[in-house]
């Protein structure tokens, strides 16, 4: 199926969901779209992403690439942790950061901790001899007073006996929205980094922190910022101006667009993603633009 035929086939369904925009909450619309995304992934997108990633790695053998922003059923995603891990590994990604929401009244911290526990379990039970285990990290996407902030911790905090430390540290974030400055500092004891997702994108609630606020309050405090996002349709160079690490991601909720935009680092210079971010030595990379037109339609209804 070519790109034009694919878009024509699903356009009617997408418009139908758009017609229900006011009547349905986002979780219901996500469930309606899930069957379509399953078809898209299997018949149209997976091969394209996988081939492009393989070419990218062939040209840059030391490059490690991964998804740094996506969601599972433990927040507002539609797929399980093991499904996301398996697809990411099949696509050829080296690392994966699932970023469940922590939002007062909506997304409790305990669900995010369960998601982290699932990542650990999947790693321990990985049995496919033909598929290398993908590197995963513990992480949250915290709702703050100024907007969302992704916090990524050292991999040691995937281990179940360390989850109580995360629970103690981050429990204030599910009781009320803290300032972004406070949230950024909370990750430091865990050897982690902070990432500003979808900057400067306004919603009716704190979502994308304004660039003006970042310049005045967050430079030197937050480690990284999304420069390219498939899910939100922007391609910028915020990181250079702000002195932060450059991040590329999808903000995938359907296990569909993972791998279309990635973050890369040189494995000769850094042992892992956290090391590269702290050194401000990462790059945002657009891998596949096949669904850019579709994502434009999706942003109107989700």
Each model region followed by its residue ranges:
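N-terminal export signals
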Residues: 5-26
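Short low-complexity, flexible loop/linker segments enriched in glycine and/or proline
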Residues: 110-114, 209-213, 261-265
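Distinct, well-ordered alpha-helical segments
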Residues: 147-151, 202-217
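Short beta-strand/loop segments at the ligand-binding rim of alpha/beta enzyme cores
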Residues: 193-194
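Short, well-ordered beta-to-alpha junction loops that form the rim of enzyme active sites
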Residues: 197-200
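Binuclear metal-dependent phosphoesterase catalytic core
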Residues: 252-302
